Amino acid sequence: MELLVSWYQSIKLSWQKLTKIIQPLVFAAIVGFACNWLGVPVGWLLGPLLVGIVYACLQEKREPLPSSFIKVSKAIIGLYSASRFSPDTLILATTYAIPVILCILVTGALSIFNGYLLWKWAGVNRLTSFLGSIPGSAATLAMMSEEFGAEPITVTVLQYIRMVIVVITIPTTVTILFPNEALETIMTVQPAVNDSIVSIFFNLPVLAGCCILGIILGDLLKLPTTGFLGAFLLGLLLFWSFPGLFFVPHWLWVIALILVGLSIGWRFNFQAVRKLWKPILLEIILVILLMLSCFVIGYEFHLITQIDLVTAILGFTPGGIEAMIATANQLGGDTGMVLAIQITRQMLILLSLYLLQLTQNISKKKAEI
């Protein structure tokens, strides 16, 4: 009898936890559908993001979303990006490698200058302000901040504010600037029939396998944006080895956007934001100025390389890689090129951080000797 009671209690507890997760997911899907129907740019992402922020404000002691949800959603986006990343895109990216790296260095220098201003004007610790201002893998930067002697909470809040501003404003602005492209491509991003000859019952298990292996690969190699890059690399292997056989269904892409949007909003911390109101206010102004600068850099890149303007602008946007891929998909931009530029920047940033960490460790060892 006691065993039955304990089973009942554990099932009841599991059900309560499940309903706490299902409820916001359902609301996120409804709001995402409404935003998409109303023509809101990247509605399936922005709608759930707003739902997540509302839940975060209303529930002080909320259960965190399962990490598997976030990893799987990023893995799906990684697979989708791989399906749009052709060998031609890789050739194009290598052709314009020098302009790409130069533009990345300019945007990186502007981000570091933002960190300098935060340190000078808002009284934020110098390392904290620099790590909080660098566009890239927000989770990785927040995780590494403590190792560098920075303040992890402040870095997380600054990175979060930048990411939310970018995700909300850039898709809307680009869609307003290029309305004709948006209207033309909305009709094409949701094809009724896929050209693939592989049955969906075989296609989905293969995609699921790529997602799972991609997450494991990402964890083993400690890749940034866990799940995304691992699945992206495996997706490239799959789609390039069997061109035209496998595909990522549109509904799977929508589910991934809902989960990513909800997870971003869910991490909103009102208490931390209230305590850091001065640095955050300055960060908002600096991020807006940085985005305007990135627009100019993207335009110059477009003039030099003749790559379409939508792709150029989204490629050099400071962060929000999933939202930029979704926007490029909606507006008919080259998602592969956007991804190539964004990933190149992430890799350069992470390489710089690892080199900095290595130098710090060597200096400490020398000091001990």
Label every PLM stretch briefly.
Residues 61-63, 83-96, 112-125, 299-304:
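Transmembrane alpha-helix boundary signature
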Residues 66-77, 97-102, 123-134, 156-161, ...:
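Cytoplasmic-side transmembrane-helix entry/capping segments in multi-pass membrane proteins
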Residues 94, 268, 280-281, 287-344:
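Membrane-interfacial helix-loop connectors
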